[in-house]
Amino acid sequence: MDTQKATFGAGCFWGVEAAFAAIPGVTATAVGYEGGSQENPSYKDVCTQDGQPNRGQPTHVEVVEIDFDPEKVSYGKLLDAFFELHDPTTLNRQGPDWGTQYRSAIFYHSPEQEAEAKAKIEALSIEGRFEPKKIVTQVVPAETFWRAEDYHQRYLEKRGMASCHI
């Protein structure tokens, strides 16, 4: 089986991972950090700046990296789920969580994924699905995925529902 990767930032990664893991055709998920400049960041590094909650300076995004079987689930279906899971019109915020680590982002792994993600955003905008707000989701090339600490992996599966926007 040849799998492909997809990486999404849609707020607190605990609930996002649980939602994607439940989709038939998704073969593996991992939560982590992507899109910042610090190497091998910790959760504390991503969520704080100078000991205070990170509310301004861009840093890594909390993301879910997904392995999926394209014979069983398309990238387009994963994009549909991504836009259902969170509010792509809120800048650096999802539910009660706010800071740049919670920004809406699609990290594409191929030119085809980039084109499909941009086309999906355009279609949603034309459809007016989120009007009067505008979609602020970033569509950027995948960078180094820094796997989050073990206690974050499958967090809701291990601990049950927590304070998460999903």
Question: Each predicted region: which residue ranges?
Answer:
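Flexible coil/turn and secondary-structure edge motifs
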Residues: 1-166
